[in-house]
Structures are given as C-alpha cells and as structure tokens.
Amino acid sequence: MKRFYPLIFSFLALGAQARELQINPGIRLPKDSLEASHLIQSLAGFLEASQSENSANTYVLPAEKFETYLLLDEFKGIEASSSFKDEHFYQPQLCNVAPLEEGQYWLQISYFGLKGDASILRASFDLIAHPDKDQFKFASPLKRNTRHWKEYKVGKSHFFYQDSLNEAHAYQLSTRFDDNLKSENKANIVYCCENLIAMERLLGLTYKIDYNGYNSSVWTVNEAGTKIMALGNDNASFENFDPHDLWHARLSMVISRRAVDHSVDEGCAYLYGGSWGYTWDEILKAFKEQVASDSGMNWHELKEKPQYFQTGEHRNSADYVVCALLVQEIEAKHGFEGVWEFLNIGPREKGNAKFYQKLESLLGISVEEYNAKVWELIENS
C-alpha cells in the first residue's frame, strides 16, 4: 500500500501545542512558488481566524461574506474531540487545489485525527480562493454552485431557488410579524434546498461526522441587519412554510434569542404559529386533554420541572403552552408592547424571579397566585 507522508505548515502555537496545516506531497500547488506560498499562508490565516467571530475573519471574501459565514460556523471547534478529550485532536489537511478562472482556486480541506494506526475523518470542506494582491480571500462555493438558479425579490428579501417557488409563502416570510417586531428594514437572503445533504454540498461541506444519519436542517446567520438562511428541510420550492419557525427567525433579526426568556419566546411561537404543523388551537386542545385534564397539576412546579405532551410524533412543552396563554392575556391588555416587555426579561434563570416580577407588573399575578391564575386562563381559553 502506498503511504503519503504530508508536508506540515505550522500556523498557530497554542501553549505547547501547534495547530498544523498538513499538505499532501502529491498535491498540485500553483507552479509559481510565490503564489503557492501566498495561497498556503492565506489559508492558514483563514483557518486560524475561523475560530473567532465571523466578522473578524479578514480572509473572507467581502462580496460573499454572508454565504461564507454559513459555512464558517461549521469550522467552530472543529479540532476538538470530546471522545478523546483532546482540544486539538483533528488537524487540517489541504487535500486538493484545482485552478479555476481569473486566478481563483478550488480547495478541499479535511480534518483528520490519528488514534494509533487509525485515521479518523471529522469533516471535509470546499472553499474558493480568490486572489487579492499578495494574498487570497476565501468564500463558500454557494454563490458559484447556485449561479444558474432563479431569484425572487419581495421587499428586502431575496430568495434563491432552482426550479419553482411558492411566492405567497415567500411574501409571508418577508412581512409577517414586521409591524410588531419593527423588522421591516431587515434584509433576508434565503437559499431554498431540497434537504440537508444537498444544502451541505452547495455550501461546501462535503462531509461532517456530526451530521451522520441526518437529512434535514436549517442554517442561519445574522450579521449587520441581514439574516441569511439555508433551508435544507424539504424546501426546494419553499412549500413547507412554518409560522412557528418564522416567529423565531424574525425575532432574531431584532434581538438575539439568547437575550430573551426562552419559554416566553416559545410561547409566542406557539400562539402565533402553532408547532410541528399543528395550529395553536390544535396544540391547545391536545394540552388540555393530556396535561390540564389532571386537576392536581401545579403550574408553578411545572415551571421548574417541565412536562411534555404529544401531537402526532412530536413532543411539546406544557410550560410553553402556559406561556402562550400568558402572552395572549398580556397582548389583550397591553398590546404587543406588553409582550415585548415580557420577552425582554433576559435569559431564563433558576427560580424564574424576573419572570414572576414582570408577570406581576403586567398582569398583577404574584408568585403565590400563579397556579390559580393559570387554571383560570386555561378554563377561559
């Protein structure tokens, strides 16, 4: 068996350990040695910066930064192995360099780890290298791979699709919740893909062990007032429009979801968009039959120890439904301004003190009254 002993290009020292870019000796680098050096040095810089904030990576091609940020997120923590308890178990290897037009190159980078004589592949990426004076900038191949796709514009939203698009759903994505969330000036870029497998290849992720066995996902990035989404959930024509996910998507354009109370956020999504394809009324009916049918249910305890109920094959949090009922009551009394206050109490904390304080401020419901008032909302719903 022929063995390849890769060249090694060390580009970052981390304490006593160096992260190394390996280069197979059989690879065909640019014939110009200076150009080859610039390419490797720039790639090393890109990989080093990939572990930081996306916007701080100066090796990203500015014209395609949003598309590249989707792929760049997949580099985060790529070297670490929890199984082997090693933060730098997987090392990058430049496997292929192929020339394209205008001095560009198609690159393939894989991350391998060694355990004894066994080589373990974590992930493989495709990148397009663009010449920029004495260095290179890098981009996801997404733009290149979809250059013959169609585009549909509505408001500040751009949809890219291969064959057909449900324009009515596209319009809803662009306008629903905007009045309340004041998100009408935020831009959307949406790539509609058949499934996760197709989406990964379009973006430049040809393999990642993390996604073994999965065929559906949605990847999103928010940056400077623009949200880019790659839909890999049977959405090549944007037929599977989900108002629940839309709520989360539009909310994240005006405030980080990490900055709001998660249970209130989910309560809004249930109330305004249902869940798993079920309407709010269907969710509420299942909740009443499976959870609220227990007259001894203590809703205060439920807040600390979640309980779930089924709609079809899907689990739903009973606490999220309770929050939806509270949001409904708050909106009836204070409009969406009150809901916005309720959302912005900050991340959930043990004991939910801020949750109860804001609830008392908005609805006059104290901690002691919480259980009885929730029962009242359920009975009146």
Identify the function of each model-found stretch.
Residues 81-110, 241-252, 263, 269-270, ...:
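Short N-terminal secondary-structure initiator segments
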Residues 17-150:
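N-terminal low-structure segments adjacent to metalloprotease catalytic domains
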Residues 30-41, 163-172, 233-241, 258-263, ...:
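Soluble non-cytosolic domains of exported or imported proteins
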Residues 1-22:
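Bacterial Sec-dependent N-terminal signal peptides
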Residues 53-54, 166-169, 337:
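Primarily extracytoplasmic ectodomains and periplasmic/lumenal surface modules that are beta-strand-rich
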Residues 237, 256-381:
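Acidic/His/Gly-enriched intrinsically disordered linker/tail segments
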Residues 37, 41-48, 175, 240, ...:
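Solvent-exposed, polar/charged alpha-helical surfaces in well-ordered, non-transmembrane soluble domains
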Residues 149-261, 354-355:
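Juxtacatalytic substrate-recognition/specificity segment
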